[in-house]
């Protein structure tokens, strides 16, 4: 099952699949929301997400809940990339966008 509310339809879904519950309920409400299921370790996915934010105008809430668990040496590196490094890059990029549109102290 794959549910995504976005301006861009994913070309393919590869394992593991991200399940976003409630996205259709949010879409049906009066709230404007955009949810993504990108691979946070892929720069192109993160850039596409940031471009979508540019199209929408601002970020009011950012929930970054990426996380994986893999075994072995290669798995450990992927764990570090997805769980520790990528969220920092996303937060930095999104923080810059937030500061462009929302005055400090709000």
Swiss-Prot record:
Keywords: Chloroplast, Fatty acid biosynthesis, Fatty acid metabolism, Lipid biosynthesis, Lipid metabolism, NADP, Oxidoreductase, Plastid. Pathway: Lipid metabolism; fatty acid biosynthesis. GO terms for biological process: fatty acid biosynthetic process. The keyword Oxidoreductase applies. It catalyses: a (3R)-hydroxyacyl-[ACP] + NADP(+) = a 3-oxoacyl-[ACP] + NADPH + H(+). It is found in: Plastid, Chloroplast; Plastid. Its EC number is 1.1.1.100. The keyword Plastid applies. GO terms for molecular function: 3-oxoacyl-[acyl-carrier-protein] reductase (NADPH) activity. SUPFAM superfamilies: NAD(P)-binding Rossmann-fold domains (SSF51735). GO terms for cellular component: chloroplast. Mesocarp. It comes from the Eukaryota. Homotetramer. Belongs to the short-chain dehydrogenases/reductases (SDR) family. Exhibits a marked preference for acyl-carrier protein derivatives over CoA derivatives as substrates. This is 3-oxoacyl-[acyl-carrier-protein] reductase.
């Amino acid at each position: 099952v794959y549910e995504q509310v976005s301006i861009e339809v994913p070309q393919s879904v590869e394992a593991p699949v991200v399940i976003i519950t409630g996205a259709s309920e949010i879409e049906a409400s009066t709230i404007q929301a955009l949810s993504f299921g990108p691979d946070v370790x892929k720069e192109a996915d993160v850039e596409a997400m940031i471009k979508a934010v540019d199209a929408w105008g601002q970020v009011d809430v950012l929930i970054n809940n990426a996380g994986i668990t893999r075994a072995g040496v290669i798995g450990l590196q992927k764990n570090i990339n997805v769980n520790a490094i990528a969220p920092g890059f996303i937060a930095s990029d999104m923080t810059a966008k937030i500061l462009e549109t929302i005055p400090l102290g709000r």
